[in-house]
Amino acid sequence: MRTLRFLLSARHLSPRAKGIPVLQTLGHKAQRPMTCSLHTSQPPGPPQTTSSAGSVAPYEDVFKKEQRNKSNFVEVLDLYCKRDTRRRGHVEIIETALRWMPEFGVEKDLEVYNKLLDVFPKEIFIPQNFIQRMFNHYPRQQECAIRVLEQMEHYGITPNKQTCFLLLQIFGDRSHPIKKYQRMMYWFPRFKYTNPFPVPAELPADPVELSRMCLHRIAADLDSRVAVHQMPYTEKCDDGKEQEHLHIVGIQSPSQVSLLAAHDPSTPVYVEGPFPLWLKKTCVYYYILRADPDPMENEEEIDNERSFYYPLSLDIQLDRDLGDDDSFDVDDVVEGPVFAMCMAGSGDERLLGKWIRGLQETNPILGQTPVVFRLNSGPQELSVPQEKEAQPKQEVEEEEREPERHRMEQ
């Protein structure tokens, strides 16, 4: 009923219901002739991009590989902190910076990590009452700070007092990032010196010094001596081209020299490799000179139970005393005795042949012993077979297209 009353009242208020013509209500606008015209226009084209100073551009296009360094990385963080005092989008900025730190070479810089934590607004995420302390207050910001500490833990970076001061100023003393910081400070000093053979923080850039350090790490005998058989140098040929000669560094101990002197000259020795050795993120390769195990030294293994009830052999050194000096024993391996090791610039037989000729000065028996090279495809030779495999594929595709060409000609 109410809707019906509203309709009746609206009808009485309309100009037609009162007997007033519609043209008079329009006034002078009704005197204009009403015409209908057809207007055609071209459809709008695609939006044109205008290069302005305020346009957004991704950082990967702004910074080239030569410009990706610590100073530019810190400059971006400073520009963001000065632009907005409220630090809107600080979580996204920090997470993006964590992903790009290896590209800028600052993934092991403690100062940069403290700079990332300084991006957080101060004294905003600290809980003010017991209810906020019960729950995870500002969980996204706390998880972001924990990710920063986890990346520091991944690269083995120990936090300092400035890191603790920033976390206290941002999240308070009972937050999850502070607990993560306390766990890191508890375990990091305990595991810092567990490795008896620590790798230096900066590896030597000289390949000869790097090979010398690596061979000393591989060799178990402290009496082993390193010999540089060839230094890297470049030589100009008669035709004007430059020929590069790579380095050869070898190592051999006195016990290995005596083992090689007692080797049968009729039995060949083998040069095998390359074998990888990782020093942090750097991978180097070494080669060994070895022989097959002596079949006369293979002893029959005694069963454990038979040896327990009826001992057939006892390995007891009765002549030893507590005052005897312990010396390094020769390790008997299943593959056979290892006589020497070396590191070379490439796995070429010609280059390794120079190493064998250098060993003949201290091991004259090598001049009478046949040497067999058992070399695998090294890292420098991996790209060559891929190019060779691509050529037969093109030939096969051309052979498959030949019948189609004959059909088209017919």
UniProtKB/Swiss-Prot annotation:
Gene Ontology CC annotation, any one: cytoplasm
Biased composition (Basic and acidic residues): 386-395
Location(s), subcellular: Cytoplasm; Nucleus; Mitochondrion
Record's keyword terms, sorted: Cytoplasm, Immunity, Innate immunity, Mitochondrion, Nucleus, Transit peptide
Keyword Nucleotide-binding included in the entry's annotation: no
SMART domains: ECSIT_Cterm
Intrachain disulfide bonds: none
Gene3D superfamilies (alphabetical): Tetratricopeptide repeat domain (1.25.40.10)
Coiled coil, from the record: none
Entry superkingdom: Eukaryota
Biological process terms in GO annotation: cell surface receptor protein serine/threonine kinase signaling pathway; innate immune response; regulation of oxidoreductase activity; regulation of protein complex stability
Transit peptide per record: 1-33
InterPro entries to which the protein is assigned, alphabetical: ECIST_C, ECSIT, ECSIT_N, TPR-like_helical_dom_sf
Key word Transferase present: no
The family this protein is said to belong to: Belongs to the ECSIT family.
Name assigned to this protein: Evolutionarily conserved signaling intermediate in Toll pathway, mitochondrial
Species annotation: Xenopus laevis (African clawed frog)
Organism classification: Eukaryota, Metazoa, Chordata, Craniata, Vertebrata
Gene: ecsit
